[in-house]
Amino acid sequence: MKTILICNQKGGVGKSMLCDEICYGLERDQVKFSLYDLDQQGSLTHEEKEVDNAAVAIVDTPGALQDDLTKWIEAADMIIVPTLMTRKDLAPLERMIKILQPFEGKKPILYVLNMYDRTNMTKDFYKWFDENYPECTTAILTRTTLLPQADACSMSIVDFAPRSTGAEHIKNIYAYIKTTLNIREGWR
């Protein structure tokens, strides 16, 4: 079983949304998965479940540093770190990068730069991240009202607004996960 850990010390950065979108992708591909929700806020659209012989386990974490986070990081086959691109997100992001540095190169770590838009602040953040952490693998997820609209309908943005930029970004993130972890359709 492949384990995908979605983590960041900061809340409100899109961990649960990404977790749900990965679940939708696995459902489309008919891949058996277990879902573990360590975040007590209950923000997931999908219900927590443990499935016998699951091919993938997805772990959604809370927005706070916990002692057992290191254990989850060690157990994960892939780590996804969503972050917003604001000044307030810099310190928590740098703490996460520091925590994950011992695992860099040993397991895939994807930093999802969430709510990307065309403002100078976003461009400056992206440039800062690229200059200071060029070794980090990143993906962009655009700022869009379609994600919460899709969530309100208990749908993936890929099904709700398939031609949108947000859907394309989610497809790219999911394709990276599938390729990196060698997840195949119908994998059980």
Describe the residue ranges of each PLM region.
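Walker A (P-loop) phosphate-binding motif
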Residues: 1-31
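Beta-strand-loop-alpha "switch" segments that mediate conformational coupling across diverse proteins
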Residues: 117, 127-158
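Short beta-strand-centered segment that lines the nucleotide-binding/catalytic pocket of NTP-utilizing
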Residues: 29-44
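Inter-lobe coupling/hinge region of RecA-like P-loop helicase motors
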Residues: 148-174
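Conserved C-terminal guanine-recognition region of P-loop GTPase G domains, centered on the G4
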Residues: 91-115
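Switch II (G3) loop of P-loop NTPases
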Residues: 36-40, 52-72
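Structural beta-sheet core signal
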Residues: 34-35, 81, 110-113
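Inter-motif core of Ras-like GTPase G domains
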Residues: 66-87
